Amino acid sequence: MKITYWSDFACPYCYIGNTRLKRAIKDLNLEVEFDIRAFELDQNAPKDVQSTTVERFAQKYGLSIEDAKKQVSQISSLGIEEGIDFKYESTLYTNTRDAHRLMKLAQDKHPETVEKLATSLFEA
């Protein structure tokens, strides 16, 4: 079976969904080939870190810093429930274009490394 999905390494829900998908595949004892496609949630995100995830949430959604911390903490809790060593609160907001380029290079030149690379990029 081949599964194609679009993902951004800056998206915590993509990481959580990827973890859930892999668990289901393992539980069902399926053989799967993944085709991971790039999707940039924010093409205009700066390359240089300018804000924390909490600050970005506050600005993007018009929240107080305290409310943004609560939202980010809820997302972290979802990841922890899935067994992810999730520290979303301390994630720095930056552009993911180069990470997607690296993934494309791996897919083209060393496809056997793609899953490990994807996990490493999510955990970075």
Spans of model-derived segments:
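Structural alpha/beta surface segment adjacent to cysteine/selenocysteine redox centers
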Residues: N18-A124
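Short active-site neighborhood of thiol/selenol oxidoreductases, capturing the structured segment around
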Residues: M1-L21, F34
